[in-house]
Amino acid sequence: MAAAKGYWQKNCGFNEREQYFLYVLGGARTHIIWSGIRYFSFFSDAANFGVHMAMGISLFGISLFYIKGVWLKIYFILVIIAAIYGMGISGTRAAIALPIGALGSFIILSRNRKACITGISVLALLFLFFVCTNIGDDNQYIRKMRSAFHPSQDASYQLRVDNRKKMRELMIHKPFGYGIGLSKGDRFYPKERMPYPPDSWLVSVWVETGIIGLVLYLAVHGVLFAWCGWILMFKIMNKRLRGLLTAWLCTAAGFYLAAYANDVMQYPNSIPIYTAFALCFAGPYIDKRMQQNKETELKNEQ
């Protein structure tokens, strides 16, 4: 649905509410730029839309190898194609990091030689395509995605680097940050505020909670990923279930790689991320129930 809405925006134009966002609220400044129009579907902005589409690519792409049924596989392939299209028209360069990060995580968690070889081959081909060739440069969306692999040539990236250096000087005296909700926006009017806009979710956490809060945040999520990975590798015996849950966890891992480059921890992106953790923790119980059902079926057949 999100990709279809993006297609409608691209070919039929924006409706009144979307035009209000663009031309009254100032969204045009970041969505109608020199490289083209960044479409945002029914999401809050193009970055949110692009990363959500990237989540669909990785989740359905990895799950495709573990599902049964021809029609279900066809449906998953159609979803992946739609998600690739949606990610492309969003013009969100950070989104490309998500499927790459998810694929890298899958290589680690798969414990399968064929999967490892396939994953490494796909990563190598992606790297060669975007870094070592100019294929598709006549397409504005491919050209924009390719620029993510050449950050030194990107003026906006260099501006972000300079801003982070200035932020670091201010944050030395703010070990607990400026306060929750004060990293961005005009919702609050505090006495003191970060003069430079945070360019990613992790930078927002750093500005709001300081180095202490950022370390705590990363530690908690590091434990979650390690714990869930351990469950998938050693606690779940059903290969199909393990593969499907691995798709969820790898998508979450790729999301945090994208969150380093862009502020994408927004609704509804946060829902699949913490759903992934919940499903992994529930995995052993689901695995046990599936095993019991299988044993019951075998007894009934006898």
Give the role of each language-model region:
Residues 247-302:
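Transmembrane alpha-helices of multi-pass inner-membrane enzymes
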Residues 64, 70-73, 101-108, 211-256:
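Hydrophobic transmembrane alpha-helices and their immediate junctions
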Residues 64-72, 109-115, 233-235, 282-302:
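Membrane-interface junctions at the ends of membrane-embedded or membrane-associated helices
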Residues 1-23, 27-35, 41-109, 229-230:
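Alpha-helical transmembrane segments of multi-pass inner-membrane proteins
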Residues 40-47, 83-84, 182, 193-229, ...:
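A conserved mid-to-late transmembrane alpha helix and its immediate loop/hinge
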Residues 4, 10-13, 87-90, 107-151, ...:
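A membrane-periplasm/extracellular boundary helix in multi-pass inner-membrane enzymes
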Residues 77-78, 96-100, 117-120, 245-249:
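Hydrophobic alpha-helical transmembrane segments
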Residues 29, 33-37, 136-141, 146-209:
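Long extracytoplasmic/lumenal interhelical loops at the membrane interface
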